[in-house]
A protein has these predicted regions:
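Dinucleotide-binding Rossmann-like beta1-alpha1 core, especially the glycine-rich loop
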Residues: 71-156
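A conserved short coil-to-beta-strand element within the FAD-binding core of flavoproteins
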Residues: 198-213
Length: 549
């Protein structure tokens, strides 16, 4: 099917109203609760099998864990130390698949792993790990790792701490924009026939004759409660499954969810001179410096979390630990003043009995049929979402799964095209009035083949200009987000569609009114409503993404 937005020319809120009516009129084969990467992947998986499938999300798509990762598509080097070989192999195979299915959103990046300590012991220990990583699948698309001398390592990373440096390993791993990838999976599912409605909360299960037969839901924009009927419900709520008041709680629950907080900082790229990504060994784990267009995304922590799961933020001690990790490997004296933003996500780990630390808790996932008509999934890694989704829909179908297999292994994500075609599109768009190579590349890296349609929208509405002076994103992307990407607030646009909430030191105060005006033109906001929306966004953005005290 062609890569066309599902909303056509209808106003987004009118379309949402029609979708809500459809949601309550139909009896679905499966109702998916949760709009993270697993829920969106499950909607696509179900649609690929020809099922009548719907998804509800209480807030925005990818508002939780799926927009707050380290932005890596990887096997997980550190899991080899814990002997989770099967998990690493599975993740590396999926990394190769995602590079094929979404080359505009997933790419390979070189990572430098500096080696410190006794030369023979250090090199042999990490060399064996890298060889195993290659054998398990990393070499399939990324090539084999290389050992670098001290001089070669310093050529790539002049700011490396020289004392005790024994050289480095150079290997490849994948990276992506997690929020935009999740959104693209959802929009692909809609293209394939799935239905998704945001700002709809599951209140309680509907039970019929001892089985779960749907859910009573609440439209968060109106407060109205509605009944949605389904042959099966899939609970893909992630860390929200740790709440004792979850709507699909069951006496037959086979596992508990243990939230683990992973925090990150963002630092200007020019602050640390390195030509690759970096993997830093710290006691008990590794930290990553992931190259973003103008920033380093640095993290992560791994601590049990017992606070509210909505909108977590980094803590002061976590930020200090991340700074210490960077300064242990680089002679840069990185400090809090260098940080432009922070963020935190919660991993929905499967809790082993008596666990006091999350560092060594398995990242494998579990699927359970907890009641007739109720399937629950949690755990896992972002990289393996497609397999998780397939397992979940297999459980929904039960014995019928073998006759209706998943079709996502070869289903390109919306906006995908071979890399040469994407490069040609960048060259073509860079010649458009008001565009240059950086803005064209920025558009294609986030929208793929749809970048051309975004530019056409911008031409029609006079929105081909930078949203932020000196940065590549254009105003047309705000209108596109509101019209075609299910964005209903400034937070949706700036935190997840454009990722500016965490990369601008002012959290977007200088552009909030302009963004509200552009989005408001699509969403029907008058001037007072625009001011309210801008103020609401800024209050939340400062709370979530500012450097903590």
């Amino acid at each position: 099917m062609p890569d066309q937005p599902h909303t056509a020319s209808r106003p987004p809120l009118a379309t949402r109203g029609a979708d809500l009516e459809h949601l309550t009129r139909e009896t679905w084969d499966v109702l998916i609760v949760g709009g993270g990467i697993v829920g969106c992947g499950a909607l696509l998986d179900a649609a690929s099998r020809g099922l009548r499938a719907a998804l509800i999300e209480q807030d925005d798509i990818a508002v939780g864990t799926s927009s707050r990762s380290s932005r890596l598509v990887h096997g997980g080097l550190r899991y080899l130390e814990q002997f989770h070989v099967g998990l690493v192999r599975e993740a590396l195979h999926e990394r190769a698949r995602l590079l094929e299915l979404a080359p505009h959103l997933v790419r390979l990046e070189k990572f430098l792993f500096p080696l410190y300590g006794r030369p023979a012991v250090t090199r042999s220990f990490y060399e064996s790990g890298m060889v195993l990583y290659d054998l398990l699948g990393s070499a399939k698309r990324g090539g084999r790792h290389h050992h670098l001398s001290v001089d070669a390592a310093l050529e790539l990373a002049p700011d490396l701490r020289r004392e005790g440096l024994q050289g480095a390993m150079l290997y490849s791993d994948g990276m992506e924009d997690d929020a935009r990838y999740t959104l693209a999976v959802l929009r692909t599912a809609i293209r394939e026939g799935g239905l998704a409605v945001t700002r709809v909360t599951a209140v309680k299960a509907i039970r019929d004759g001892g089985r779960v037969a749907g859910a009573t839901v609440r439209d968060e924009l109106t407060g109205v409660e509605l009944d949605v009927r389904a042959a099966a419900v899939l609970d893909a709520t992630g860390v929200w499954g740790a709440r004792p008041d979850r709507p699909f709680g069951s006496e037959k629950a086979t596992f508990n969810v243990l939230p683990s907080r992973g925090s990150h900082i963002l630092v200007p790229r020019e602050r640390i001179e390195v030509r690759t990504g970096v993997t830093i060994r710290v006691p008990g784990k590794v930290a990553f410096m992931v190259p973003w267009p103008r920033h380093w995304v640095i993290g992560t922590t791994d601590d049990p979390f017992t606070g509210p799961v909505d909108r977590p933020s980094a803590s002061g001690p976590e930020v200090e630990r991340i700074l210490a990790a960077v300064n242990s490997a680089f002679d840069v004296g990185l400090s809090r003043e260098d940080i432009v933003g922070t963020y935190a996500g919660l991993r929905p780990l499967i809790a082993p009995s008596g666990a006091s630390s999350t560092v060594k808790v398995s990242r494998e996932h579990k699927v359970a049929v907890e009641d007739r008509g109720l399937v629950r999934i949690s755990g896992g890694k972002y990289t393996t979402y497609r397999l998780m989704a397939s397992d979940a829909i297999d459980a929904v179908l039960g014995a019928d799964a073998k006759d209706r297999p998943s079709g996502t292994a070869d289903l390109p994500i919306i906006g995908a095209a071979p890399r040469p075609e994407l490069d040609a599109l960048i060259a073509r768009l860079s010649r458009e009035p008001g565009m240059d190579v950086e803005s064209a590349r920025s558009l294609v890296d986030r929208h793929g083949t749809e970048a051309e349609t975004v530019v056409e929208l911008g031409r029609r509405r006079d929105l081909i200009r930078p949203l932020v002076a000196g940065q590549p994103m254009i105003e047309a992307e705000v209108a596109w987000a509101a019209e075609h990407e299910l964005a209903l607030s400034l937070d949706d646009v700036l935190a997840r569609r454009m990722r500016l909430a965490m990369t601008l030191r002012d959290r977007g105060e200088s552009i909030a009114s302009r963004v509200a005006a552009i989005a408001g033109d699509v969403l029907g906001w008058d001037a007072p409503r625009q001011a309210i929306e801008a103020a609401r966004y800024l209050e939340g953005a400062h709370r979530e993404f500012d450097v903590p005290a």
